[in-house]
Each structure stands twice: as structure tokens, then as C-alpha cells.
Curated annotation (Swiss-Prot):
Basic and acidic residues bias (residue ranges): 183-193
Biased composition (Acidic residues): 1-18
N-acetylalanine modified-residue sites: 2
Reported function: A phosphoprotein adapter involved in the XPO1-mediated U snRNA export from the nucleus. Bridge components required for U snRNA export, the cap binding complex (CBC)-bound snRNA on the one hand and the GTPase Ran in its active GTP-bound form together with the export receptor XPO1 on the other. Its phosphorylation in the nucleus is required for U snRNA export complex assembly and export, while its dephosphorylation in the cytoplasm causes export complex disassembly. It is recycled back to the nucleus via the importin alpha/beta heterodimeric import receptor.
GO CC terms, sorted: Cajal body; cytosol; neuronal cell body; nucleoplasm; nucleus; ribonucleoprotein complex
Region annotation Disordered: where it falls in the sequence: 1-33, 83-111, 183-211
Span(s) of short sequence motif Nuclear export signal: 130-139
Compartments (UniProt record): Nucleus, Nucleoplasm; Nucleus, Cajal body; Cytoplasm
Protein's UniProt name: Phosphorylated adapter RNA export protein
Record keywords, A-Z: Acetylation, Cytoplasm, Nucleus, Phosphoprotein, Protein transport, RNA-binding, Transport
The protein's assembly and partners: Found in a U snRNA export complex with PHAX/RNUXA, NCBP1/CBP80, NCBP2/CBP20, RAN, XPO1 and m7G-capped RNA. Part of a precomplex with PHAX/RNUXA, NCBP1/CBP80, NCBP2/CBP20 and m7G-capped RNA. Interacts with NCBP1/CBP80. Found in a complex with snoRNA. Interacts with NCBP2/CBP20. Interacts with DDX39A; this interaction stimulates PHAX RNA binding activity.
Amino acid sequence: MALEVGDMEDGQLSDSDSDMTVAPSDRPLQLPKVLGGDSAMRAFQNTATACAPVSHYRAVESVDSSEESFSDSDDDSCLWKRKRQKCFNPPPKPEPFQFGQSSQKPPVAGGKKINNIWGAVLQEQNQDAVATELGILGMEGTIDRSRQSETYNYLLAKKLRKESQEHTKDLDKELDEYMHGGKKMGSKEEENGQGHLKRKRPVKDRLGNRPEMNYKGRYEITAEDSQEKVADEISFRLQEPKKDLIARVVRIIGNKKAIELLMETAEVEQNGGLFIMNGSRRRTPGGVFLNLLKNTPSISEEQIKDIFYIENQKEYENKKAARKRRTQVLGKKMKQAIKSLNFQEDDDTSRETFASDTNEALASLDESQEGHAEAKLEAEEAIEVDHSHDLDIF
């Protein structure tokens, strides 16, 4: 072996396979220059199978013979086409718009609901506009039922609210007529505050714009002046419409004490005024004056009762009239309920018992309505006023 290696010239390769081994994959493929027919196809398939990389995505069986390759080529192409059709879904065709039908489409069974928020808002706005036009014309429109159990019948609610407001206005009107005795209150009574006004009115309706105190006044007043002059000047400076109340204050406590209270009121108003008990608004100058009057230790409780006796009496009459009005409304409702009841002919006992109880209740209501007016409260029985917000005078 050594001789053979020594006899070899430089650059000459050995013919034995032991010296150098060549991998089958490293050997170049030797193809004939001219190929024809089956030999060319067989060589092409061998080359493709040898050079094809290993793929785990799709596994294709190797083809052994040319006959099987020709017979299976059509089946393989059909299989690939079927798989490709499964992977790609064609886009749905748009449906033509149908005029004369509602824009809301019924939900498709098994389909996903489209979250079209602004479309739903626009649709509700259009329905509200249509319902408003129908309400103006005296017709009732349809309500959107897309929210199912959360649907709010706003048309019915609006109608019921309107009827309730009209019923409340009628009751207030009847109460005002009863309290005024069927007469319209004159302007003089309104200025003096002697007219019977309905209770629980808004503050702006009762007071209007808050008056500002006139600090200078028209002229100077002293303790030697007449009570009429002092009361008139105090009412002017306080912008108080209830002049008779100020006149009673001056008559009971005297000119000197009334002027001192006026000076204290001016000082409080210049420092910002006083709030009422709940703190929702400031007192009027007249309210500050009367609040200082009730909180002055030198003025006795008997004097305060004498000053506010008429106001307490009016408040009592107003409450009494309101209570009587509520009783009348309750009696009317009871009569309507009795008329709407249907008793069974066999149940005579329950019918007689109910009828006797109802007649007694209605008789008591009629007696309370037909009874004479009660005597006015005496000075000892007058309602005591602990706070200024108990009266409707500020």
C-alpha cells in the first residue's frame, strides 16, 4: 500500500474507496444530455424527490412509479382545490335596500349581533321626533321595543303626568276659591298682606325679589314722635309689606324699643344679614327685625303672643281649610270606590256590614263639611311660634 502511495504522482487520486468516502448527498447528479420519453420523466421525479425539503405542514407520500403519478395527479389537484375552498370564505353579497319597510332588521338566528351604537341612537331620536309629532296631532305613536323589558312607555308617562298636573291645578283653584270665600282678593289686601294665600307656595311667588333695606329713610324719627309716624317709617325702611304687623309691634313695645330694633337690624344687614333656619336663603329686612324682636330678653312672651296673634290665627285657619279640603277629596274617592265595587248576591252579611260602615264614614264626612265655623282661638290657645320660619310672613 505504501508503494502504491509512493508511486503516485503529485495531484493523482487513488482509485480505492477506503481513502476517501463521499456522502450520497454530496455526489453530483449526472444526467444524460439527451433524454426522451419515460426516462426524462423518471429522472425529473427522482431529482424532485431528492431535492425536496422536509416539511411538517403538509405530508405528501412519495410516488414510486410513473403510472401511479399519472393516475393520482388529477386526484391530488382536486384535493388541493377542496382544501383551498375551505380556507377562504367568500364575502356575503349585500342585500338590496327595500323601500317602505322599517330600517330595523330582525336578528339572524345564530348570527352575531352588530354593536351599532350610533345607529341605535339615531333611530331612537327619529322615533322620538315621530312620537312628538303624533302627540301634537292627538295620536299615540309606537314605542321602540328593542330593549324588551327595559322599554319605557314615555308616551303614557307624559300623558299621566299631564293629567296629574291638571288635577292638581283644579284642586289648588278650588282651595283658593274656598279660602277667599268666592271673592277675588283686592290689591290693597295684597299690599297689606291680609289676603288668604295658599300654603306651601314657592319662595319667589310669596316674596318675589328680595328687598333691600333703605338705611337713610325719608326722615328722622325719635321716641317723641307718634306711633303712626314711627310705624310708617320703620315699614318704609324695612321694605315690609305687612304694615299692620309693624304697627302692632310699635304699639305693644313702644317707640323707643322699636327704634332700637331698627338700628340693630340695619347693623345686621350691613354685615351680611341672617339666614333662615335651614340656611337655604337670607331673611328679608322685615324678617331680621322680627327675629331680633323674638330674641330680645326684655320683651316678654305675652307681648310676642299679642303681636303675632292675628298671624297665628290665619295660619290655623289655613291649616284647617287644607285639612277640610283633604277630607272632601277623600270622601269623593270613597264614593267613587263604592260605586265601582261589585258584591256577590250570595254574600249578604259582608254587604250589609260594609254598607253600614261606609254610611257611617260618609255621614261623619258630611257632618264635618256641613258643620258651622268654629270659634276663633283665644289668646291663651294661640299657636306659639318658636322660629321665624313657622310663619309665612317673611
